[in-house]
């Protein structure tokens, strides 16, 4: 929280609204009453509307109503909301990265490239302490992701994931359902890393 009023989730919400996105689903974690109180009616982000709007989704990973263990399981728990959306493309974003991003050119580039997944990343010089809890991409000259490192013990110039991803809604649904059928729950490890050479990731 910043200044007692703002929270980290305000950044991705503002980015989405400023990018013209009118339908946003927030998958919560445990003890989320304070988040509900903070988001209120969603009027602050102009998301209090009859079509689209802000949807608060419970933190359950499956029919047994247990807390989700990873991004894949969280998305599977929100599958009813996802399938009812009329959006053709989806942006997945964590809420703990402070960024100011216009998503419109990113989505346009994703469509033009024909990628399965477009990952938003930052290239910079990092210490080993900075990078040890991050996902790092190795990319070629055409900015295709060639390999993925998770929580690596490295330092220097790295391209690190900002945990923002663009993909088609159809690809998301197919990927989540396939991963769950195989018992996979980690988007980073089971999708980005394991299928890096199979998928086109930009």
Q: Which positions does each model-derived feature cover?
A:
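Unchanged
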Residues: 1-202
């Amino acid at each position: 929280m910043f200044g007692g009023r703002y929270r980290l989730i305000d950044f991705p919400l503002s980015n989405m609204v400023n990018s013209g996105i009118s339908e946003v689903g927030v998958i919560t974690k445990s003890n989320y009453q304070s988040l509900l109180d903070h988001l209120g009616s969603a009027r602050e982000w102009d998301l209090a509307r009859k079509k689209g709007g802000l949807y608060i989704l419970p933190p359950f990973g499956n029919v047994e109503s247990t807390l989700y263990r990873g991004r894949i399981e969280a998305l599977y728990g929100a599958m009813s909301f996802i399938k009812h959306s009329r959006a053709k493309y989806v942006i997945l974003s964590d809420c703990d990265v402070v960024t100011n991003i216009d998503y419109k050119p990113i989505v346009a580039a994703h469509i033009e490239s024909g990628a399965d997944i477009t990952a938003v990343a930052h290239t910079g010089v990092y210490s080993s302490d900075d990078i040890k809890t991050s996902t790092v991409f190795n990319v070629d000259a055409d900015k295709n992701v060639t390999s993925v490192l998770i929580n690596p013990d490295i330092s220097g110039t790295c391209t690190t994931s900002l945990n923002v991803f663009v993909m088609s809604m159809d690809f998301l649904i197919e990927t989540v359902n396939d991963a769950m059928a195989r018992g996979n729950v980690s988007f980073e490890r089971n999708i980005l890393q394991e299928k890096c050479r199979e998928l086109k990731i930009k």
